[in-house]
Amino acid sequence: MKRIILLASCVFASYTALHAQKKIYIPEDLRKMDLQADTSQWSFKRSIETDDLILMWERGFGSDTSNPPMLEGKPMSFNLTNLRDRVQEFYHFFRDTLAFSLPGSKADKYKMMVMVNYSLDGTAYGGTYDNFIGALWVAPNRIQDAKMNCMAHELGHSFQLQIPADSVGDAWGGSGFFEMTSQWMLWQVNPGWLTDENYHFEAFKQLTHKAYLHLDNIYHSPFVIQWWSDLHGRKSIAELYRQGRIGEDPVMTYKRMYNMSQKQFCDEMFRGYQHLVNFDFNHARKETRQYACTFDTETEGGKWLRPKNYPEEYGFNAIKLDDKVNLNARKFRLNIQGDNLRYGFVGITTDDQSVYSDVNATEFVVPKSKRLSPLYLIVMGAPLQHYHIPMPTDENYKNPQKLLEFPYSFRIFATR
């Protein structure tokens, strides 16, 4: 995400829209323009409004967004009505259901802004104008799908950054967690997200060993956030943002909010990964059935097996045991060698019921009259203390700090 916060003085201009309850904030970038003239780059003559939004499109489109001039031989049309309606739906959901905006927000008085650029740039941005009101910027090539997935993601950023704009939270000063959260917010309004953007899930299955908050996974993995939402309610994620402090990361804030020790946090993260295997969440159960139990960490070795990639901090391996033991057995036993780990089993019965072992269990007993298909061993890296995942800088971008790995090996035995 490109955090667009354009600093301005505390003095601002505003335009009161006719018959609109909320006002329109005039960003510093637009104040030198005649916004009433259709010859200006941005003009109220090329805009539409809802109760909560103003959508503006650049001069190059002309007045008809369904039939604008081509740019470098490329069509520039988009469905303005669908864009308006979908973003308004997202707005209501993020405000009312997820509580990313609370009473007293500047968004109570001012409309968020959707700016459609006459450009072939494939990048969309969500943030705020002048650190004052939520806004997003997009080109037509990102708003061609009827579901407007890109808009849900970017409006998520607008709401995230409205929190510091309202001075009700620092939200850690920025981190990859913003991208994870926008993917989660998109997933909430589109339960079919895993299908629409399946490449993210396929990539994540190859990278589950990566540390939580690792930048390689920030677009792939809203699943821990979903787990936290299951545990504490959907509105808890926005509250996490409000409670965030500069100098913390989301894990530190989360532990402080819920008064958790490092051991408790590791146990809870492991439980979340057990649930992830079969997508046992309160959200999108039907839509995730085709992706349930598709994790399969590669292993190597002889009698003692080890994963191809050891887990990093809070990263995990989901090792499918179907070809390693006889699933008709009633009991399974684990021998594991390694330090600072969380491990245990997840069995999925043939009638799609999940059976979880305790944390650090070395035995798994199949419930009576049940048969398994499949059985998983879950192993997670569990650091004794939490520390920041280093963000890339100009100095370390090509050679980032190497993260801790948690090596282990294991054997599985099945008994009748």
Show which residues each predicted segment covers.
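Bacterial Sec-dependent N-terminal signal peptides
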Residues: 1-22
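Beta/coil-rich, acidic/histidine-enriched accessory regions frequently appended to metallopeptidases
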Residues: 248-416
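Juxtacatalytic substrate-recognition/specificity segment
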Residues: 49-174, 182, 192-193
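Short, solvent-exposed secondary-structure boundary motifs
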Residues: 30-38, 114-119, 352-358
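Residues that line or immediately flank small-molecule/substrate-binding pockets and catalytic motifs
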Residues: 8, 12, 162-163, 244
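Acidic/His/Gly-enriched intrinsically disordered linker/tail segments
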Residues: 128-129, 145-150, 165-231, 235, ...
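Generic, well-ordered alpha-helical scaffold segments in large soluble proteins
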Residues: 11, 158, 228-231
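Zymogen propeptides/activation segments of proteases
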Residues: 21-85, 89, 93-97, 341-343, ...
